[in-house]
From Swiss-Prot:
Its main location: membrane. The gene is KCS19. Belongs to the thiolase-like superfamily. Chalcone/stilbene synthases family. It is an enzyme of class 2 (transferase). Keywords: Acyltransferase, Membrane, Transferase, Transmembrane, Transmembrane helix. It comes from Arabidopsis thaliana. It is a single-pass membrane protein. This is 3-ketoacyl-CoA synthase 19.
Amino acid sequence: MELFSLSSLLLLSTLFVFYIFKFVFKRRNQRNCYMLHYECYKGMEERKLDTETCAKVVQRNKNLGLEEYRFLLRTMASSGIGEETYGPRNVLEGREDSPTLLDAHSEMDEIMFDTLDKLFHKTKGSISPSDIDILVVNVSLFAPSPSLTSRVINRYKMREDIKSYNLSGLGCSASVISIDIVQRMFETRENALALVVSTETMGPHWYCGKDRSMMLSNCLFRAGGSSVLLTNAARFKNQALMKLVTVVRAHVGSDDEAYSCCIQMEDRDGHPGFLLTKYLKKAAARALTKNLQVLLPRVLPVKELIRYAIVRALKRRTSAKREPASSGIGLNLKTGLQHFCIHPGGRAIIEGVGKSLGLTEFDIEPARMALHRFGNTSSGGLWYVLGYMEAKNRLKKGEKILMMSMGAGFESNNCVWEVLKDLDDKNVWEDSVDRYPELSRIPNPFVEKYDWINDDTMSFVRVD
């Protein structure tokens, strides 16, 4: 009898341990987030904003005087944006001062459905729209009813039990926020498939006034977007491009200057637009610092963290100037990260992040080239940078990529991906990647063609 009781107890204990291990293993698998595929939007030839087209758009704004023209053309010439970015249809048609709801819907449909059609075509035979369990769409400045997620669900006839999330007002860093939401959803759903669609409406929000701080958005932002397919299903692991390592979000919106440095508003004449203040760079640096203070200890080797701590301690003892721990000065990020996917928000942002983190020209090249070829495409911009890395055959199995995004709020949302196999898809860069980085070194046509506007002897001229 005692032997039977002992055997029963041993059996129960074994079963208990087995189910504990099974539960832990299952939870660990559910927390996995694999990237199966991503697609970026590339517009048609007639949608390109070259020198001539940009000049015509500027000249149509009758609110501008000579000084405003000078400011705009100087900004365009120094923006780091090339001749082949894409603009919204209503602006190219000369209707930027009278956009319609149809313009906004048409712009969204073109970008969302183009990227999703290509994505489903690539996964045809293994994944269909009816297999999608989670859908997240992030567009900051356009929140219609029915929602954009409903528009996608209707177009692709997705299941009735799909979990959909429509995000607005989150700026250029919204794509990483969407990935964070998906990862958290994966913890409660087994063998799930998720779509993240990231884009922005440019046409209805083109600024037609003369406030210099609000003109900047016209010079930087362009039409673009992306769709990303994610899963936590182990059966897709061998097909996956990358695996999510970690996500960190930082929000410094409690500071008034950080909150208002990038904000939608009307100017004194009632023209709506997006205000970018001189505090933007400082807010970005602060948010990025807060973020990296949490993220870097998760991905850098202990040996490098100990070395850095010792160096900082010695500096303190010798009364050396104290450097911020997360700035990258003295901390070798290459010990745990091989690639740096910086949000292509503007030349100053890219170069500022690169300098503060001690990155090389090679490291920031993908962001600079994405800005030159496609412009600032808001939350979708990171995926053009990633696409450049892949098209250049830079991404090898086992390497890690740090994605850094910043946006209104002010927020810094970063994530790290591990490459699961060598990647070489030419994607949206197929027709231009071989011309880069050389193409970006060609002098901006604005400088040569409109240099006369900087001549002070021409100040008496009236431009209309």
